[in-house]
Curated annotation (Swiss-Prot):
Any Pfam family hit: RemA-like
Organism: Bacillus pumilus (strain SAFR-032)
HAMAP family, per the entry: RemA
PANTHER family to which the protein is assigned, alphabetical: REGULATORY PROTEIN SSL2874-RELATED (PTHR38449:SF1), REGULATORY PROTEIN TM_1690-RELATED (PTHR38449)
Name the record gives this protein: Putative regulatory protein BPUM_1466
InterPro entries: RemA-like
Family: Belongs to the RemA family.
Amino acid sequence: MTIKLINIGFGNIISANRMISIVSPESAPIKRMIQDARDRGMLIDATYGRRTRAVVIMDSDHVILSAVQPETVAQRLSVKEEIIDEGQG
């Protein structure tokens, strides 16, 4: 299995293989999830003080805050997969 890395803004990179979901931080359940992760010490804030626009949930139970839109992160992931697929074919 190849390691796929995704840029989530400001030079911060995460492993796409470990990612479970990318969600918007607007809903109350996601806000509770962020607070719970902060209390447990499992929150990674990669926003550099900017507004949180995407919340990335990892399989290690870490919650990562990003300042880029969820659609942008998803697009970067799909472009990365297309490049890998073309290289194998």
